[in-house]
């Protein structure tokens, strides 16, 4: 399909996908910015999702490498979560057509307030790692479960995946925000590639638009991950709240409009 956009719209997309990469690497939720941007630029929905996954996967790859080099990833847990996430995202891509928009919207209205309460009222969201470093059967199953559940969410819904991964890793695995964010990147990377593979096989990625946006997204991810690693909880927590507010606002606007 021959899709063309104006130079001004291309510049707009490059700017927005760069900002999306910054937000996503810091707290997750970059898709909330980039998906509407692609749609606004005139890409059909299927091409929007595919091209967004392409640029997001490229950016997340570099952010994940940044977190890994800084020692902010529990590799064993990250690999297990990635396996679960890949499977969950692949399954989500197949079942999404079975769910109505109303059901998905209702699910999100139930999930977001809970997430907001956890962040707002759990004052001791850890800035120190409470994990003892061991990996037993319980933690193995928990890591696989977190990966599968959030990967499934990413395949079915999408925006906010990284934010929910941070919440899951801090509250369930005992990670500090920095390590939770790093492992969330590994999880999100696997989920992105699971979806991207499907889109590539169907020829839905618009490369002449996606490649410049991918470069911008990479730069945004590198900058955002730098701030997240340097500032830690002081930077990540406010960004998480901003993303949750944006998510809730999008749901309300979708319901009203």
Region annotations inferred by a language model:
Residues 1-44, 130-181:
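Selected transmembrane alpha-helices and immediately adjacent juxtamembrane segments
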Residues 10, 53, 108-112, 116, ...:
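Residues within membrane-spanning alpha-helices of integral membrane proteins
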Residues 14, 18, 22, 53, ...:
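Residue-level signature of the transmembrane alpha-helical core
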Residues 40, 93, 97, 106, ...:
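Transmembrane helix-loop junction
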Residues 46-50, 181-185:
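Small-residue hotspots at the loop-to-helix junctions and early N-terminal turns
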Residues 50-103, 107-110, 192-242:
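Selective hydrophobic functional segments
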Residues 62-72, 109-135, 248-257:
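Transmembrane helix exit motif
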Residues 147-157, 195-203, 210, 247-257:
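Hydrophobic alpha-helical transmembrane segments in multi-pass integral membrane proteins
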């Amino acid at each position: 399909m021959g899709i063309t956009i104006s130079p001004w719209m291309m510049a707009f997309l490059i700017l927005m996908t760069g900002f999306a990469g910054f937000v996503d690497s810091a707290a997750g939720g970059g898709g909330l910015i980039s998906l509407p941007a692609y749609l606004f630029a005139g890409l059909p929905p299927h091409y929007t999702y595919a091209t967004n996954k392409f640029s997001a996967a490229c950016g997340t790859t570099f952010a994940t490498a940044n977190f890994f080099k800084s020692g902010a990833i529990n590799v064993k847990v990250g690999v297990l979560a990635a396996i679960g996430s890949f499977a969950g995202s692949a399954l989500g891509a197949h079942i999404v057509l079975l769910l109505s928009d109303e059901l998905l919207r209702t699910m999100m209205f139930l999930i977001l307030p809970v997430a907001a309460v956890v962040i707002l009222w759990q004052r001791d969201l850890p800035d120190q790692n409470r994990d003892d470093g061991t990996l037993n059967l319980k933690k193995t199953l928990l890591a696989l479960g977190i990966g599968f559940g959030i990967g499934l969410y990413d395949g079915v819904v999408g925006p906010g995946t990284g934010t929910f991964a941070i919440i899951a890793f801090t509250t369930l695995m005992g990670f500090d925000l920095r390590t939770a964010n790093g492992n969330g990147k590994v999880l999100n990377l696997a989920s992105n590639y699971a979806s991207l593979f499907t889109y590539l096989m169907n020829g839905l990625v618009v490369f002449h638009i996606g490649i410049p946006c991918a470069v911008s997204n990479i730069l945004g991810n590198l900058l955002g991950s730098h701030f997240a690693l340097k500032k830690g909880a002081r930077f990540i927590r406010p960004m998480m709240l901003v993303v949750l507010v944006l998510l809730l606002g999008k749901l309300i606007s979708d319901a009203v409009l």
